């Protein structure tokens, strides 16, 4: 758009996090305002409706933590559903597993996919061309409702923060529908917000999943571009989860292609729940 640099800020409860750089894209889609900026430190960074979604600098903290605890521990992983994920990072991590036969990516905003394919090739890369991937421009809630029982082995909810058009992705009814379309041993993996900046939402997600599924586990790590810098991912299943039970040979192969995730990192991240969150969950 212009070679002039400017500050773009995300505001949250009296605080702000800003990046200075050249604006590559600024437009409003059917659903949200989309801004893509190029920053000296973070590289290209994507903002949706005033919230930073991803950047080239730190996106692997997010995508590797969302995907690999589930896919490296589950034996059957033929059919995968990604809700959201229009930047391509979750797809990129999924296609590393040869056992996967089909990946359905359901993204409501086609503009996010188009922009990511053109300007964020460093994230999705060749994963967009993987023959196992089918892209559906659709509402994730509606997609889940029309899916037959016991169809997916893993569901990834790679959504933005709760908003007017994404609130239902955090609802009891939606999680129950996800449980219905998962196989009996399937895993739901979702970003579950920050225990600091979005504490109440975070606790609500954890309590809801605990009530709906037989078992759930939450891990914490860093995503510097997000409010407070600490983020979480929660994994839930109708069976007893054992995310530390891994196929050693497969884990070592996947670790070689990761920048952040490895088994030691994962095991530590599952032990990082702040005590104030523990108390809230026990109350």
Swiss-Prot record:
Sorted UniProt keywords: Cytoplasm, Polyamine biosynthesis, Spermidine biosynthesis, Transferase
Positions of spermidine binding: 63, 87, 158-161
Catalytic activity: S-adenosyl 3-(methylsulfanyl)propylamine + putrescine = S-methyl-5'-thioadenosine + spermidine + H(+)
Enzyme class: transferase
InterPro entries xrefs: PABS, PABS_CS, SAM-dependent_MTases_sf, Spermi_synthase, Spermidine_synt_N, Spermidine_synt_N_sf
Gene Ontology CC terms, in alphabetical order: cytoplasm
Residues forming the catalytic site: 158 (proton acceptor)
Pathway participation: Amine and polyamine biosynthesis; spermidine biosynthesis; spermidine from putrescine: step 1/1
Localization of this protein: Cytoplasm
Gene3D superfamilies in the cross-refs: Spermidine synthase, tetramerisation domain, Vaccinia Virus protein VP39
EC number: 2.5.1.16
Binding positions (S-methyl-5'-thioadenosine): 32, 107, 139-140
Family classification: Belongs to the spermidine/spermine synthase family.
Protein name: Polyamine aminopropyltransferase
Source organism of the structure: Prochlorococcus marinus (strain MIT 9215)
Species classification: Bacteria, Bacillati, Cyanobacteriota, Cyanophyceae, Synechococcales
Gene: speE
């Amino acid at each position: 758009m212009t070679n002039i640099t400017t500050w773009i800020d995300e505001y949250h409860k009296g605080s702000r996090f800003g990046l200075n750089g050249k604006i590559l894209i600024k437009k409003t889609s059917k659903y949200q305002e989309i801004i893509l900026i190029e920053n000296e430190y973070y590289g290209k960074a994507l903002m949706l409706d005033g919230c930073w979604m991803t950047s080239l600098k730190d996106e692997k903290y997010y995508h590797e933590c969302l995907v690999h605890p589930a896919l490296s521990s589950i034996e059957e992983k033929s059919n995968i559903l990604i809700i959201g994920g229009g930047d391509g990072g979750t797809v990129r991590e999924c296609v590393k597993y040869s056992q996967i036969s089909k990946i359905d990516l359901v993204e409501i905003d086609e503009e996010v996919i188009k922009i990511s394919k053109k300007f964020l090739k460093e994230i999705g890369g060749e994963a967009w061309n993987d023959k196992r991937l089918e892209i559906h421009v659709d509402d994730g809630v509606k997609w889940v409702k029309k899916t037959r029982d016991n169809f997916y082995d893993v569901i990834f909810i790679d959504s933005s923060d709760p908003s007017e058009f994404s609130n239902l992705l955090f609802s009891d009814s939606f999680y129950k529908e996800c449980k219905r379309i998962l196989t009996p041993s399937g895993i739901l993996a979702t970003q579950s917000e920050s225990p600091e900046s979005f504490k109440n939402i975070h606790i609500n997600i954890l309590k809801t999943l605990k009530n709906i599924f037989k078992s759930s586990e939450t891990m914490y790590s860093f995503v510097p571009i997000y409010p407070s810098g600490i983020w979480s991912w929660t994994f839930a299943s109708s069976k007893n989860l054992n995310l530390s039970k891994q196929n050693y040979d497969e884990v070592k192969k996947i670790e070689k292609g990761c920048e952040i995730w490895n088994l030691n990192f994962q095991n530590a991240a599952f032990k990082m729940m702040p005590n104030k969150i523990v108390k809230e969950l026990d109350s």
